[in-house]
Amino acid sequence: YGIMRKVIGLANYHLNQVKTYEAEIYMKGTALFDRLPRAIAKRIEVNDIRVKEDKAYMLESLNEVTYQAPDNYDMKILASQNTIPGYSEAVNPMDYVNASLYQEEIEGFVSPLARSAFFYYNFSFEGSYIQGTHMIDKIRVTPKRKSQQLCEGYIYIVEDLWCLHSSDLEINTIAGTLYLEQLYANVIMDAWLPVSHKIDMNVEIAGVRANITYVSSLEYEEVELNPNLPRSYFASTSQGQGAEPEKKEPSEEQQRIQEILEKEELNNRDMAKLNKLMEKEVEASEDEEESLQ
């Protein structure tokens, strides 16, 4: 629980640590229908072409994305193809790339990193391993009750940075079981950013049985961190890319954050205080950015 209190307390920080980035995003979606009632197949028929059982359908695209915090995206489709009958719209890869566990909710289910996570989940430490210069902690996530708004599985945490390394979660929905896998990488100066996503869903509803999969991968070309959120909270464990932002004298709130993080064990009160302080830090960084514009 000590690990998770630090991760949850710093979720707002990691959610807002990037100011801008440019990236190339590849996305591929596939669908295979094991069982498809004729009435439903008829409804999605286009020009006498209908979706068939035991045939794989695919859509994929290569995209160039420019991101500007907090939520501005400029996307250019470089290439795309689609074999799904009647489906002409391009899928926006940002719908999947933006699915961050640092948010309170993702598509209606409560994130295990939400401020209220301890009300919904039990966490257990199941060991650790070394990757490069980092210690990675394996945390089991178990919902306290059965609900379509809760997930279960594993999250992996980068120790001392208290950020996500990866996740392997499943959610039981009314339409079937959804599996969510994410992988993060140390892209710049110990800032771990998402580099791959996989959503796999076994659908069983209204007589339909199918498997639907989306995978996406990101290759970052340029990344600029939020200069108003200091990296001094963490001891640097690798050189990374890019230059260290100019250091500023820590504010009173930043000193309080540092004091909490230096504690060996955090209690729930410390976690709530850390989360609140970090929320103020993010708001202050946004105000400072607006004043410079």
Where are these regions (language model features)?
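A conserved hydrophobic secondary-structure block that centers on an alpha-helix together
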Residues: M135-I136, T142-Y154, V158, C163-E170
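Solvent-exposed loop/turn segments connecting transmembrane beta-strands
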Residues: F33, S147-L150, N172-T177, R209
